């Protein structure tokens, strides 16, 4: 598809495939977050993290959506240092749902609410909950 070719050319520095197998939304979100937050993205299939903030060295996991739920990894060993959850708007802009540490989200919502996981793989988080938590993130923990 031409749109895929265009995305690959425009964002070639990030080396994303923009494939139509369910990763398209994630790839788009990652490159938009990389530009907005000054991230260097890791190659595909890197566990836990999608990239690192160049100016601070903070490692981040990015979850992207088009107004749907976001997923947070299950397991203490999979909690990312920093977690970005974004909605990609129709005009290509990002709505930041959550920008903070993974530990803050985990302790202040998942543990506090005794949230149920899906088959020990992830927790499902609504955009509304993410926005509420985002308002509580300490300023020093924002990318």
Positions of the model-derived regions?
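Nucleic-acid endonuclease domains
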Residues: 1-143
